[in-house]
């Protein structure tokens, strides 16, 4: 929306055919990103675009089959897939949360298992249609959780931890590695697992009662 007399411009996001370059270039502030009032729909839309980005990049690197790209792109792909799952889980939660959701966010944060357990009572009918698929997904989350419960392992290959010196009380900064050594990952299996989980969560979000077969081809180990 263009309005040269307005300091801050509102740009609804995400939206159809959005152009982030479409703003008043003379305004004091370029634009203010806003979402619609429906929190659940916003989380769902963001989840969809994160998933699409992960899928497109995965197809690209698998088609090219270049070892250097497979190594370099794994972390971004894993982050995009993982975050799409978190967003879809939160979309489900906010379909049923009637208050501001502050308690939900505080209690679950980025933890996939905690979010899944929080929403389970709301989607019990959908889960009962294929509880084995739900338990498979939950086991996969439990295996991922020690590595990435705070949604930062795939954004950065390490995290900064702050500790206080026991004697002087000074702050000490240390680096914690998420992966201590070389790890071999089947990217095709990993991507397929993420896409199966996303499909299951989409059916929960849409209150569809579906049965699944594809997950049976894969174990629940990260």
Where are these predicted regions, by residue range?
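Domain-scale activation on soluble regions of proteins
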Residues: 1-222
């Amino acid at each position: 929306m263009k309005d040269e007399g307005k300091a801050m411009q509102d740009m609804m996001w995400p939206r159809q055919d959005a152009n982030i370059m479409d703003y008043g270039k003379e305004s004091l502030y370029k634009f203010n990103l806003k979402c619609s009032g429906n929190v659940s729909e916003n989380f769902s839309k963001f989840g969809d675009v994160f998933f699409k980005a992960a899928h497109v990049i995965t197809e690209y690197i698998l088609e090219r089959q270049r070892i250097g790209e497979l190594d370099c792109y794994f972390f971004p792909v894993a982050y995009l897939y993982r975050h799409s799952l978190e967003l879809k889980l939160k979309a489900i939660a906010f379909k049923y949360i009637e208050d501001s959701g502050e308690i939900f966010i505080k209690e679950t944060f980025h933890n996939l298992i905690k979010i899944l357990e929080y929403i389970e009572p709301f989607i019990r009918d959908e889960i009962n249609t294929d509880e084995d698929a739900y338990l498979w997904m939950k086991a996969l989350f439990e295996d991922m959780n020690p590595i990435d419960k705070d949604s930062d392992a795939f954004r950065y290959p390490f995290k900064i931890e702050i500790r206080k010196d026991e004697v002087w009380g000074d702050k000490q900064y240390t680096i914690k590695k998420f992966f201590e050594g070389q790890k071999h990952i089947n990217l095709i299996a990993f991507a397929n697992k993420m896409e199966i989980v996303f499909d299951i969560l989409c059916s929960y979000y849409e209150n569809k009662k579906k049965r699944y077969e594809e997950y049976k081809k894969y174990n629940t180990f990260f």
